[in-house]
């Protein structure tokens, strides 16, 4: 069995991976996301970011042959504009105000790299999420919890912001940060059966 390495500091990704895999390592990627400019295609962009994270970690462990590195990146898009992590409370408020009453997309790019062979596969998942109409007071109260500050799109579906979600079309785990079904099929493609 290959050693699985998750190239992520995200606690949410680690928790999700623990649901399907008992034994894996975490090595945080030091990949500079700004080194890949966003051109136009969000799905290609998130796959490139995921690959960059996986390759960054693989360079740290090149002397260890039996490793598969999982890279992942998740972005929120609204009107073909990327909503990253908010810079401050005002930014978080504005993001949530824009999402209020509207549908947006959550994209996750996945990359799995076999360190020994340098074989890499990439893929992405897109989930559509519709928010209810939110009041300014609801948004302000949520922003003041601090919860939105480390999350793309300024919300976490698995937390207090779950009540904002009117409906979801696609993979719930993608919105949390790690699309488990897609990851499982990619791991199988790389010879890992969970």
Swiss-Prot record:
Its cofactor is a divalent metal cation. One of its GO terms (molecular function) is dTTP diphosphatase activity. This is dTTP/UTP pyrophosphatase. The record marks 12, 74, 158 as: Important for substrate specificity. The active site is at residue 73. Keywords: Cytoplasm, Hydrolase, Nucleotide metabolism. It catalyses: dTTP + H2O = dTMP + diphosphate + H(+); UTP + H2O = UMP + diphosphate + H(+). One of its GO terms (cellular component) is cytoplasm. CDD domains: Maf (cd00555). It is found in: Cytoplasm. It comes from Clostridium botulinum (strain Kyoto / Type A2). One of its GO terms (biological process) is nucleotide metabolic process. Its EC number is 3.6.1.9. Gene3D superfamilies: 3.90.950.10. Nucleoside triphosphate pyrophosphatase that hydrolyzes dTTP and UTP. May have a dual role in cell division arrest and in preventing the incorporation of modified nucleotides into cellular nucleic acids. HAMAP family: Maf. Belongs to the Maf family. YhdE subfamily. Its main location: cytoplasm.
